[in-house]
Amino acid sequence: MGLTTMYESLGVSRAVYEYGETILAALKPRFEAIDQTAEYNQTKVLAAMQKNKLSAGCFAATTGYGYDDMGREVLEKVYADCFHTEAALVRPQITCGTHALAVALSANLLPGDELLSPNGAPYDTLEEVIGIRPSKCSLMEYGVQYRQVDLLPDGTFDFDGIRAAIGPKTKLITIQRSKGYATRPSFSVAQIGELIAFCKQCKPDVLCMVDNCYGEFVERVEPSDVGADMIVGSLIKNPGGGLAPIGGYICGTAECVERCAYRLSAPGLGQEVGANLGLLPSLYEGFFLAPNVVSGALKGAIFAANVYERLGFRVVPNGTESRHDIIQAVELGSAEGMLAFCRGIQAAAPVDSYVTPVPWAMPGYDAEVVMAAGAFVQGSSIELSADGPVREPYAVYYQGGLTWYHAKLGVLLSLQKMLDAGLAKLPG
């Protein structure tokens, strides 16, 4: 049985498969560059593990308080060394990226302090954390002030506006690397470094925190290499490599991370407690595999951009732009288009491939969200997935794929479902 026949058995027509192969022929140089970045980042992770003398004893499970958990301590040293920070907090007790960000913000902001977002409105779930949408226990409820500076029309930072917004009470600047549910470009590490340097010039003691979700290992450097006081992310995204079943991380200065540890557990306890519950082998191995897994997801995003751009759909980033995260936005023009695309991603899944994604009122969002994610880990967005709020401009956000081949299948099946619904047409 040939490869084309295998794809046909999974629901991809010969015409769609051949269209995909035409697109791929032009992407080989870009894929080679991605492989080189993955190789570099693989050696970076390996060096951090070797430096900290990772041993089989580090995989031992702990329960209860988790005192003297050698494996947990080594894991945090590995993260700190890999991301070039003074300290790290890497815990399964951090349930998601939003939780990690909430810990980092609430630990380092006190009543009367001001939080500034220089990239406009934050990701949807952070609106309630901050209090933009009123919520119990939000930062605003505790007396933290909030200000934001919108991006310029071309998606770049408004440096004049940022300079004017930074004042005596500005304590922390939160920078969102990835686009989230927006159609702006994601920021490169170089752009983030330029912003941080500018903010520090305006107010030398201001803290700069970067939401690093979806960006880890996409480039050879991280925001922590260009002056970020904290970088924050989720282990069921890039750094977990698809194996971490839960968790989040905060890497940064010793002072910032110490405060985060006290906020996560309790004052006086900090990093000394927190049992690993037998999860360390998955957290270590996932981190080791992450550079390669991210490279496959990145190839899938570039493939999706080129597949849909050639058919006339607006894609962000476009088919030739440089990449700074694994997310690919595709504007499909209608709710029907979003649902068809997501049906294709779900049909490509190893888990729950037979179910049909439908919009639902997801906690933390102000519009119904449709999600396709037949994943081994619930909510894992380093696994093949697609989602988006069902509202204008009806953009679906595609990401992940534990292997490049799985990402490729997902993109082709999404297109097949679009064609079957009469919502797209192949060229020629």
Tell what function each PLM region has:
Residues 3-28, 35, 45-58, 66-69, ...:
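Conserved PLP-enzyme active-site core in the AAT-like
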